[in-house]
Amino acid sequence: MKSRIAILAGFGLALAGCTTATIASNPLQARWNGKAAGAFFAAYGPPLSDTAGAGGTTLYKWRGGFVKGKSCTVELTVNDGYKINNIRAIGDRVDPKGGPSHCEKVLDAADAK
């Protein structure tokens, strides 16, 4: 009986350690998902705002990349370990020639496709 409890406890701990990884669906996610949020903010500046989310996550809003009337605005979902779970452009400029977007260029994600 004790061995069953120990085995079940082991399975429970193993499952508790599992997390769902966000699959990168764009160059920003490919470049930044799983990276330290501190590295992002050190390279590009502090966020505009932060909001507490579910499960210990924090939603940060960042804006920068001001060049010739263009800017980039993204939302970063950061876990309690201060790693980026997801990054999403909410204000971006598409390249009319089909190249990388303004946010992809500014946030070093143009080659992350």
Question: Locations of the language-model features?
Answer:
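Bacterial N-terminal signal peptides that target proteins for export
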Residues: 1-8
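Residues within mature, well-folded domains
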Residues: 19-113
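C-terminal motif of bacterial Sec signal peptides marking the signal peptidase cleavage site
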Residues: 14-17
